[in-house]
Amino acid sequence: NTRLPLKIKRGMSIAFIGNTLLDRSQDFGYLETLLHQAHPSHDLTIRNLAWSADALGLQPRPANFADTDQHLVFVKADIIFTAFGFNESFAGPSGLAKFRGDLANYIAATKAKAFNGKTGPRLVLLSPIANENVEGVNAAVNNTNIRLYTEAMRDVAAAQRVGFVD
């Protein structure tokens, strides 16, 4: 079970996985900085394993490249921040039931693995961010879908007892 705010112990390993939200965050380092700033003497290990376009059911990688679980074992993840839901939202309302099921299955399977060799990880789900309304794109259409997927994530997170940040 993961309760927010997180109680982070000295020496913990934190991993970021998921879509472009976290993939691009490695260009700026804000999340890592905030975690280190909040826990300056904790000697945390923080690794960004996110890839643009990742979705719950699709994580394309080059041939002979380890999968996400193998990387989580390598970094001995104690806490995992996940960013999913944005890419899945393009399926619209008709894809919502599948997304709920996939997310619940993903959380249950991930919690059952001891990437650190001792215990299952604590999970924090991050909601997808809104589409920017730029010229040539009607962001309002997908922002409606994103709201639906965000609420589904909130519900699944509560049922699975993992953290959720919107």
Language-model-derived ranges and their functions:
Residues 1-10:
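N-terminal pre-domain segments of enzymes
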Residues 3, 16, 166:
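Residue-level signal for pocket-adjacent positions within structured domains
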Residues 8, 29-47, 54-166:
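Alpha-helical cap/lid subdomain in secreted, periplasmic
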Residues 12-27, 52-57:
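Catalytic nucleophile-elbow at a beta strand-turn-alpha helix junction centered on a G-D-S/GDSL motif
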